[in-house]
């Protein structure tokens, strides 16, 4: 299967990343990526952009040379209540919100706390997808989290970089998440988690896991722009007419 959507990328606005949005566009074109989300880290990360960066994403064109750009954020889950580090009053400025755990904001503790925090973020209604839920630094009750994600229609990310360099030891957890999502009716999204444009759309490990698990293609949001956009609209996000022809 050809995947044409990447929901997780970073730019130089997160200063441990090395590409601009402009850098991503020719790579997207060359790789057949029709839609990607710019999702820099939420403001509570030490080197993240100020929240004005996200508020001002409306200056970006919707489509450049046939490639769509979604305005997003990888917010931080801050506490056991599932709160995130982006002001709710500005949420309408974004097309999507991804949220996850990052050690500088939420120090790892115990499985019960991680699980409750993630489930509360899912239940909050503010989060469209959970980033790298298979991170072994933050063990969770996978069955409980996937059940909540299915019930509240929040996508779970398969993060391709988790299998290579970012979060060693993730594969077993990710496999269990895929299998639970398959059985419980949850949605998956694929993220390259690119911190440099060259890795945009790299999903080889994600594809391998869903293929081995027999995960249904119709619940993989990376398969087409329409699949992702319909999912976001079903969660109450705004219709984006400029993406009609992607």
From Swiss-Prot:
InterPro entries in the record: Phosphatase_YcdX_put, PHP_dom, PHP_phosphatase, Pol/His_phosphatase_N, Pol/histidinol_Pase-like
Family listed: Belongs to the PHP family.
GO molecular function: phosphatase activity; zinc ion binding
HAMAP family: YcdX_phosphat (MF_01561)
Assigned keywords, A-Z: Hydrolase, Metal-binding, Zinc
Entry note: cofactor: Binds 3 Zn(2+) ions per subunit.
Taxonomic classification: Bacteria, Pseudomonadati, Pseudomonadota, Gammaproteobacteria, Aeromonadales
UniProt entry tagged with the keyword 4Fe-4S: no
Highest taxon listed in the record's lineage: Bacteria
One Gene Ontology cellular component: cytosol
PANTHER family linked to this entry: PHOSPHATASE YCDX-RELATED
Source organism per UniProt: Aeromonas hydrophila subsp. hydrophila (strain ATCC 7966 / DSM 30187 / BCRC 13018 / CCUG 14551 / JCM 1027 / KCTC 2358 / NCIMB 9240 / NCTC 8049)
Residues holding Zn(2+) 1: 8, 10, 74, 193
Residues where Zn(2+) 2 binds: 16, 41, 195
Cofactor names: Zn(2+)
Pfam families the record matches: PHP
EC id: 3.1.3.-
Name this polypeptide is given: Probable phosphatase AHA_1344
BP terms from Gene Ontology: bacterial-type flagellum-dependent swarming motility
